[in-house]
Every structure is written in C-alpha cells, then in structure tokens.
C-alpha cells in the first residue's frame, strides 16, 4: 500500500529531507547510507518528478548532501552521548520521517519521536514505534508543558497519550534533546 502525501500540506514538508537522504544514498554510497529513506520513498504516493528533475542540479545535490551530513552529525552526537549515558532518553523533536533515534539505539535508551499530529499519524503507518520507542503527536505550543511532559515521560512517571502541548516556536527547540533517566 502506498501512502498519499498531498501538495501544500504539513506532511509535504517531510518530502525534501527524505528525498535528500535517498538521493545521497544513491549518489554517495561510500559517504552516506539511509536504506530507510530509500524504502520509505517507495511507500509514498507523491509526484517526485520535480524533485527528480531538480536532483540533476549541483545546488540540489549540495543541499541534499547538507541534509545527509546533518543526519550524520546528529547521529554521531547521539551515539557519543549514549556512550556515557546509556539509559538516557533521546528526544527527537520535529522527527518527521527521520530514523536517527532508532539508528542510534544502544539497546538501553528510550526514544521519543515528536511532531505534529498529522505527521505522527503518517509516521505511525510508515515507521511504527519500536520496543523502547514512542511516536508522540505534539502541538508545540506551550514550552513549559512540553518540558514537564518530556521529563515525566523520560522518568517513566507517565505514558504519552493523545496530543502533547509544546513550545510557541518550533525554531526555539533543538532537533534532539537528552534527558538523563534517574
């Protein structure tokens, strides 16, 4: 089954980074590999013709490489942190269809993927949560509520259910945060 992504929707914003990771996997296999991105592209019903046309340009390839290298940098940081904090919670804010948390899983950490409700709905279909992983719909409106909620989740005090409130500006948040489990 293919999952339809409509033009001019929040879900469409998932396409550029996903396609960029797929493109780099094909163009630079010795530098970057993301088989999940390749697999997901095949599961999505979307008109990729413009992305394919643009992928021939040097600027598009450079942009795709930037996306891929950012993923590598984030993964490196997460793995380094997990070496000294193996039971940490990895919080992937604005996760989209990113698989970095799972790719860095050390077998002991917990992974929380947060994004807008419609993005998480698609993610649940394409990348269902693993054993120590949760996909959490989040509205990103109230930062205090978001921080408290994440701390409680990381400590195992509460289990996410429904939609998580969050900060007023997504740009105020890093992609990954770490909360040490007590």
What annotation goes with each model-predicted range?
Residues 1-91, 95-138, 143-144, 152:
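Rossmann-like AdoMet
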């Amino acid at each position: 089954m293919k999952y339809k992504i409509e033009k001019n929707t929040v879900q469409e914003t998932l396409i550029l980074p996903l396609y960029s990771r797929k493109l780099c996997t094909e163009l630079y296999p010795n530098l970057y590999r993301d088989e999940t991105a390749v697999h997901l592209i095949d599961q999505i019903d979307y008109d990729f013709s413009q992305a394919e046309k643009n992928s021939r340009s040097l600027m598009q390839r450079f942009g795709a490489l930037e996306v891929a290298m950012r993923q590598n940098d984030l993964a490196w940081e997460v793995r380094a942190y997990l070496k000294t904090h193996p039971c940490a919670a990895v919080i992937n804010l604005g996760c989209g269809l990113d698989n970095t948390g799972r790719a860095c899983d050390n077998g002991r950490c917990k992974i929380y993927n947060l994004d807008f409700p419609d993005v998480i709905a698609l993610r649940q279909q394409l990348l269902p949560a693993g054993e120590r992983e949760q996909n959490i719909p989040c509205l990103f409106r109230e930062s205090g509520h978001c921080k408290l909620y994440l701390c409680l989740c990381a400590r195992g005090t509460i289990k996410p259910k429904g939609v998580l409130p969050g900060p007023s500006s997504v740009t105020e948040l890093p992609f990954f945060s770490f909360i040490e489990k007590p």
